[in-house]
Each structure stands twice: as C-alpha cells, then as structure tokens.
Amino acid sequence: MSKLYLMSLGCNKNLVDSEIMLGRLSAYELCDEPSKADVIIVNTCGFIDSAKKESINAILDLHEQRKKDSLLVVTGCLMQRYREELMKELPEVDLFTGVGDYERVDEMILKKTNLFSNSTYLQSENSKRIITGSNSHAFIKIAEGCNQKCSFCAIPSFKGKLKSREISSIIAELKDLVARGYKDFSFIAQDTSSYLFDKGEKDGLIRLIDEVEKIKGIRAARILYLYPTSASEALIKRIIASEIFVNYFDMPLQHISDNMLKIMKRGANSTRLKEMLNLMKSAPNSFLRTGFIVGHPGESEADFEELCEFVKDFGFDRVSVFAYSKEEDTAAFDMEQVSFKVINKRLKIIEKIVNEVIEKSFEKEVGQKRLVVCTGESSEGEFFIAAKDLRWDREIDGEILINESECGNLEMGQIYECEILQNLDKKLLAKALRKVDAN
C-alpha cells in the first residue's frame, strides 16, 4: 500500500479541506514520517506574511526529507494566491493546485497533472472526509468565501465571494458524524454570521441552529468567527436560548477605536460592538474570545491606548493579538504605514496586557464546577488525563488536567462534571465528580 504524509497549515477551515483530501485518498496508508511517504501533500496558508513564510519553509523542508520518486503536492490558499510566482520559483514541487479541487486530488495524483478550478471548493453531503485529531469533536464548515471588505484582509481576493452550503447538506453531514460517534461540533466559515446572506436570507444561522437541535446525539456545539455587522441581536439571543449551542462567543473585533474601525472598514462603531459584547457577556457561563490587530495604517498612539484600556477592562476569556501585515490586494496596502519599530513596541505592550487578562480568566475558574470532555493522556505526564471545558473550542482555549476521580476510570470522549481545583500557569487542575451521560 502506498504511503501518504499530509501537512495542514493555517486555520481549522484549512483542516477541513485537508480532511476532505484524506477522504479522497483513503486507499493510502497515512504515515508520520515524510521520508517514508510516496505522496507528500502540503495544504498551505496565505493569510499574512508569517503564514506565507511558514508554508514556504515547510515545502522546502519536506523536499529535503522526501525519498526518491515520491510526489510533492502543494495546495491551498498560498498556491491560489500566488499561483504563477510559485510555479516558477518552486521547482522542488511536482504538482500544484489551489482551493478549488480538493475532491479531485486523487485524480491529479493519478494523472500527475496540475489542477486549478476557477471557483472555490464547497463540500457537499456526499464529500468523503476523514476526521483527524479527535474521536468526539469535528469542525463543520458551513460556507466559503467572504463578502466583507476589511482594509487589511486579502481573503476575498483568493477565496472569492460568500458561498453557503445548503442546510440539508450540513444536516446530512452531522447525522453521518453522529452515527460515527461524534457529538461535539464547531461551526466555521470566514464569516459564519453571514451564512445564507448569499441566498437572500438574513440570520440563516438561526434556522441552522433550529435544525441542528433536532438531531439526537449532539452533546455540544459552538459557532466560531462571528462578524460584528452580520451577527444580529436575534442570533445572539438564539444561541443563549439553545440547549445544544454553548454560550461560546468568538468575534474577532480587530480594534475598538472608532477612528480605526472606520479606517479598517469594519462596518460597526465601538458603541455597537460594546452592546453586542455586553449581550454575550450577560449569558449564563458565557465564554468570550476575540482578536485584535495592532499597527494598522492610521493607528495613532491615542487609538492604541484606547484599545489597551478596553482589553484590560472588559474581561475577555481569550484574546489573540497580531501585528499588522501589509498585504497585496488590500485597501491598506497603499496607505501610509506605521513603522515596524512602533508596531513591535505596541505588540509587546498589548501582549503583556493580554497575558494578564487570560490569566485572570483561568484564575476565576478555580472552585467552579464545569462539564468537560476527556481527550486523552496529557502531555504533562501519565498521571493526568487531558480534558477540555465543554464550552471551549478544540485545542486553542486551554487544557484541563484531571488527576482525581470520584467516578472510576475515565473514558475518552466522555463527558464528566469536574471541580476545578487549581490554575497551573494557564492549565486547570481538576477532579472528576460524576459521569454526565452514557452516549
């Protein structure tokens, strides 16, 4: 049996595309060592400069490790964005494809030919997919592309306009995954709250939530990447009212200064953002995640200070911060740039604030009772079982370490009520109290 090595870089949306490719290549034996693989696939990220460099370095590194007569295949956003340049500058690569042909990867390998469709790939209920990284959780991609016009973002230039999957397609995929034992789902897209806008339906997510709740066997779900102008008050209230969708609110804000929100073409002012955030925060057991960019063209010292004060005071649970990356095909590319020195200085300042904010969020968990799902043996050692809070997304929000149990041996993928005993440098030590369900 031929062997396959696949490296998926970038976001969880890329991961879903990689899992689609694995589904098409199920005849191959997956291997952990690229030096033993007959086919090596790199699914690249082309979002910002650091991601582009990571993708190029990965390609060159894998070429160095590959065995003679193996195939090196490069796909994904970086290839779609820089197709002509990379095909000239990467003679190490055997086959190239972009973001439109994930379900034809088996065909291109068989025929040893490049493939570049004009449209972005959108999976259907018939798409074969091999879930990786968990036996109980899966990401569900509900749309591709984006209609927003953020000044800093090039994604619409290579992913295209919003294309939503039909609700029936998503429900069919969910039912199949539930039948295979999956019961925890994260719904993703470039802009999830614009779901079905392209089909003339506002608040399409509400209808999707209604349909998801009818499926027996789903224990928890969450929605990632809400966009401030497309996420309505009705949607937030529907999530809060749901018995399946947890009160996990992931909304990248990018800034809070009205001046910067206008320059960044975010479509909402700080008053609107704070109203939305306060509604989310009012939900029982709410968990708020966001992200900000520092050093975008036009950011004054006053804008930055306003952002820092807001991050310090609001009480987010998780915050990501990024240095502005100058990207071709964006409105910000031709604006007067903030110097690298100033950007790096601001990044260090806000990273310190963010670390303190996240530490407070972990600390307030001590003494709480939380529903958690066991994910396996912890990297901290054989005496700990790793788990995640049922509200959290997979991997990015933290780890719970269980070293005591009042309910016997713990089962992977099973849900338990735990008491949080201690915060150990952003990892929570916990005791399992009881098994919650037997599904």
UniProtKB/Swiss-Prot annotation:
Residues engaged in binding [4Fe-4S] cluster 1: C11, C45, C77
PANTHER family: RIBOSOMAL PROTEIN S12 METHYLTHIOTRANSFERASE RIMO, RIBOSOMAL PROTEIN US12 METHYLTHIOTRANSFERASE RIMO
Xref: Gene3D superfamilies: Methylthiotransferase, N-terminal domain, tm_1862 like domain
Residue ranges constituting the MTTase N-terminal domain according to the UniProt record: 2-114
Entry's family note: Belongs to the methylthiotransferase family. RimO subfamily.
Enzyme class: transferase
Cofactor: binding comment: Binds 2 [4Fe-4S] clusters. One cluster is coordinated with 3 cysteines and an exchangeable S-adenosyl-L-methionine.
Function: Catalyzes the methylthiolation of an aspartic acid residue of ribosomal protein uS12.
NCBIfam families, per database record: 30S ribosomal protein S12 methylthiotransferase RimO, MiaB/RimO family radical SAM methylthiotransferase
UniProt-listed InterPro entries: Elp3/MiaA/NifB-like_rSAM, Methylthiotransferase, Methylthiotransferase_CS, Methylthiotransferase_N, Methylthiotransferase_N_sf, Ribosomal_uS12_MeSTrfase_RimO, rSAM, rSAM_horseshoe
Reactions it catalyzes: L-aspartate(89)-[ribosomal protein uS12]-hydrogen + (sulfur carrier)-SH + AH2 + 2 S-adenosyl-L-methionine = 3-methylsulfanyl-L-aspartate(89)-[ribosomal protein uS12]-hydrogen + (sulfur carrier)-H + 5'-deoxyadenosine + L-methionine + A + S-adenosyl-L-homocysteine + 2 H(+)
Main location group: cytoplasm
A cellular component term, taken from the record's GO annotations: cytosol
Coiled-coil portions: none
Pfam families registered for this protein in UniProt: Radical_SAM, UPF0004
Gene Ontology terms, MF aspect: 4 iron, 4 sulfur cluster binding; aspartic acid methylthiotransferase activity; metal ion binding; protein methylthiotransferase activity
SMART domains: Elp3
Cellular localization per UniProt: Cytoplasm
Cofactor(s) needed: [4Fe-4S] cluster
Residues binding [4Fe-4S] cluster 2, per UniProt: C146, C150, C153
BP terms from Gene Ontology: tRNA modification
Organism superkingdom: Bacteria
Record keywords: 4Fe-4S, Cytoplasm, Iron, Iron-sulfur, Metal-binding, S-adenosyl-L-methionine, Transferase
This protein's name: Ribosomal protein uS12 methylthiotransferase RimO
